[in-house]
Amino acid sequence: MHIGFFSDQHPATLGGLQVSLELQREHLQRRGHTVTVCAPNSKRTTSPSSAHTNDVHLASIQVGDHSFTLAGARFDATIDLAFANKPPVVCVHVQGDLWGAWNGYRFAARHNLPLIHTMHTNIEVGLPAILPFPRTVFRLLFAAQQRFLDATRVRTIAEYTRAFAERADILIAPSTHFAKHLHGYGIDKEIQVLPTGVDDELIQVLLSEPRAPRARPILLWPGRISQEKRISDFFEAFHQANVDADIHVYGSGVDLAHARKRVAELRLTHRVHFFGAVSHRRVLAAMRNADAVVQSSLGYETQGLTVYEAVSVGTPVILRDRSIAHDLPVEFSHMAADDSIDAFASIIRKFVQLKHESKVRLAASEQFTQSQLTIRLETLYRKAQEIHEHHPTHERFGGNQRAA
């Protein structure tokens, strides 16, 4: 099969979704399929290996770490021309919730193709976290949805999300808690839960390597350093916990300067170490060597990619957002009692004390191996084709998409 991935962000930029795209692509290709990603161009690519020359890159505007683009007739023509020189696409897999989704749905409608949509983003929380004037942004977003998807009425996030759901053959959520959240918008069709996976072979290599000695426990925080990730809350809680441990931060982002400043204000510079944006393999190796991986955001994550990776290399996780724990093995999860800094500090303190008392290392979980998840994804692609044969795109997608 030739699968067309449509994403809001370039696959070679920093972020959990981008890691997921590349891993899905790699494992689908191992099984004989072809994958082409259509996404905005970016000046912030971190991995040359992810910059596939056969992908379709759209003109975009760079704002911080994110690329912004649109949809419409000009983009339709660009996308169709690019795909015309490739094998025919048999299924569209939208892995975005903004311009990537608009372009993917329009492409599927023009070519009468089955469409699967993995809803990765909690837009209601995510957009206000990265953009100023959220009310204005949402009004523009809703207007764009009406125009580019020929939707009759979009005035709320629920209507925005349902407009996609009504047109998709299959919906996927990356976690149980986010699937429930989407159903809360009034989506009545079944939502498949398919988490982001981890690379089996790389995990096995890392598990075979010995862990490095350390003077004290290492608490690792990986990801994009931005306001919605609340890394400064982690520093506050760590300071309050007053434990004999080190923090290793892997990642970069627009909030890095503020994070460094907060570390200095709390007089933690001797305990907090910033390693910057490094390769995904190096982050996984650091997770393997850590005593715990820490998740500090609240209500933002649609899944727990970094904590999925952590348990896959046998490393426990300290969770502030308790909803993420639903899909994790119980023995790996150490959850804050509530959303407060006090509760966060308490679970950090309890975990470090536990590490002093117990030397037992948990066996790595195999729950999130990408090879197994890819087999499930293939099944969903075939199911989407069957559904589409009975309910073609044009029956759910009115209007002339070239005219928008």
Task: List each model region and its residues.
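Short hydrophobic beta-strand element within catalytic cores of glycosyltransferases
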Residues: 307, 312, 316-319
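Carbohydrate-associated surface elements
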Residues: 177, 197
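Conserved donor-binding/catalytic core segment of Leloir-type glycosyltransferases
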Residues: 172, 211-240, 248
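Conserved acidic donor-binding segment of nucleotide-sugar-dependent glycosyltransferases
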Residues: 321, 330-342, 349-355
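Acidic donor-binding loop of glycosyltransferase active sites
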Residues: 169, 288-302
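A charged, aromatic-enriched C-terminal amphipathic alpha-helix characteristic of glycosyltransferases
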Residues: 353-392
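Membrane-proximal helix-turn-helix segments that form the acceptor-binding/catalytic region
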Residues: 140-170
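Nucleotide-activated donor-binding/catalytic signature segment of Leloir-type glycosyltransferases, i.e.
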Residues: 258-278
